[in-house]
């Protein structure tokens, strides 16, 4: 008879950790007022990604900084989303994300542009694996809201394959320009 492991059907995710990179975005000292005075602790905000199209964020609170970072990292790994990237380096189309008073606009960029984004958005794009993007944050500059708005926008991104599947067409039909065949649109006209 085969030996049964004692995990009770749970997966062991500890083996997957080396494939993810993480970035500490913010750390705050927080306090809780109790009967005897104030209890101080730390809150950490972490972005985790595989730099190949998956990203997530988490926040953790603890009495010590390393424990708060560990909790935030674990939460981020549980909340990862997959984002389709064009040529593995940029977004497929311009997108806008919102969360609370925060609004984020993200635009595709030609190769060599780099990541033009501020603060927490830069961490999200680096962990996602985006190499060329232009992003602007409007409204709330709170790092929690900026990250949530960025991820809201990234969830809305669709690849040509997804659009073609939804419309019941071929990818080549979706990539046509103004009624031209896809091959003619891809190649410049000879003069």
Curated annotation (Swiss-Prot):
Family: Belongs to the universal ribosomal protein uS5 family.
S5 DRBM domain: residues covered: 20-83
Lineage: Bacteria, Pseudomonadati, Pseudomonadota, Alphaproteobacteria, Rhodobacterales
Pfam families cross-referenced by the UniProt entry: Ribosomal_S5 (PF00333), Ribosomal_S5_C (PF03719)
Summary of the function given for this chain in its UniProt record: With S4 and S12 plays an important role in translational accuracy.
PANTHER family assigned to the protein according to its UniProt record, in alphabetical order: MITOCHONDRIAL RIBOSOMAL PROTEIN S5
Disordered: region residues: 158-191
Domain of life: Bacteria
Composition bias, Low complexity: 182-191
Annotated keywords: Ribonucleoprotein, Ribosomal protein, RNA-binding, rRNA-binding
GO aspect biological process, one term: translation
Protein name: Small ribosomal subunit protein uS5
Domain notes: The N-terminal domain interacts with the head of the 30S subunit; the C-terminal domain interacts with the body and contacts protein S4. The interaction surface between S4 and S5 is involved in control of translational fidelity.
HAMAP family, sorted: Ribosomal_uS5_B
Quaternary assembly: Part of the 30S ribosomal subunit. Contacts proteins S4 and S8.
Bias type Basic and acidic residues, positions: 170-180
GO cellular component: small ribosomal subunit
GO molecular function: rRNA binding; structural constituent of ribosome
PROSITE patterns: RIBOSOMAL_S5 (PS00585), S5_DSRBD (PS50881)
UniProt feature coiled coil, ranges: none
């Amino acid at each position: 008879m085969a030996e049964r492991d004692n995990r009770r059907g749970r997966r062991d995710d500890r083996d997957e950790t080396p494939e993810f990179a993480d970035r500490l975005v913010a750390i705050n000292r927080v306090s809780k007022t109790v009967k005897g005075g104030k209890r101080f602790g730390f809150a950490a905000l972490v972005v985790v990604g595989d730099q190949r199209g998956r990203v997530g964020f988490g926040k953790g609170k603890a009495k010590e900084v390393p424990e708060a970072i560990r909790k935030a990292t674990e939460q981020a790994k549980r909340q990862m989303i997959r984002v389709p990237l064009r040529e593995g380096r940029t977004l497929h189309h311009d997108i806008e994300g919102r969360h609370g008073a925060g609004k984020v606009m993200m635009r595709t960029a030609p190769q060599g542009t780099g990541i033009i984004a501020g603060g927490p958005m830069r961490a999200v794009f680096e962990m996602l694996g985006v190499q060329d993007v232009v992003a602007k944050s409007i409204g709330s500059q709170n790092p929690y809201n900026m990250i949530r708005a960025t991820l809201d926008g990234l969830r809305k991104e669709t690849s040509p394959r997804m659009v073609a599947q939804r419309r019941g067409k071929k990818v080549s039909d979706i990539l046509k320009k103004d009624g031209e065949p896809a091959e003619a649109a891809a190649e410049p006209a000879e003069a």
